[in-house]
A protein has these predicted regions:
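Short, flexible active-site loop motifs that bind/organize anionic cofactors or intermediates
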Residues: 14, 18, 42, 99
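A solvent-exposed, acidic/Ser-Thr-rich amphipathic alpha-helical stretch
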Residues: 25-77
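Short charge-dense sequence patches
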Residues: 1-11, 48-52, 109
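Residues at structural and domain junctions
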Residues: 13-14, 38-41, 88
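Short acidic-aromatic low-complexity motifs
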Residues: 2-34
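A beta-strand edge to alpha-helix "cap/lid" segment located at domain peripheries
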Residues: 4, 53, 59-120
Length: 120
């Protein structure tokens, strides 16, 4: 399946906001390449769908009620793009913010670079 960069950026936020492990894994299998890499500035590098699933689940377990919301439209350039987002409990002020940069290959995410930002 081939996805646009904008869709991939938004669906990546869904992965980290999903509480149901089976649904999260289904999205991971759909939007990430088998050899994908996730660069987390605080926790290191995660390689492959299994590791991305594991870290997304671990993050969600520490903040089960947090959701990720884009704060601007995605920026796209060639096979890459970025999206700025905030995360927190619905109905409350955001707890933290970040920017995800992705590189896509054949309609799937091959790499995600996470940057934490100051709250807007």
């Amino acid at each position: 399946m081939s996805n646009s960069i904008s869709i991939l950026l938004r669906r990546n936020l869904d992965v980290f906001g999903e509480n149901d492990p089976a649904r999260r894994r289904a999205v991971i299998d759909e939007i990430f390449t088998e050899d994908c890499v996730f660069y987390d500035p605080n926790n290191g590098i995660y390689r492959g769908r299994d590791e991305i699933d594991r870290i997304a689940g671990a993050i969600k377990a520490t903040r089960p009620d947090f959701q990720y919301q884009p704060i601007v439209e995605p920026d796209v350039s060639g096979d890459g793009g970025r999206i700025q987002w905030v995360s927190g409990r619905p109905g409350e002020a955001p707890a933290y913010a970040g920017t995800d940069f992705i590189v896509a290959r054949e309609g799937r995410i091959a790499a995600v670079y996470l940057f934490f930002d100051k709250l807007p």
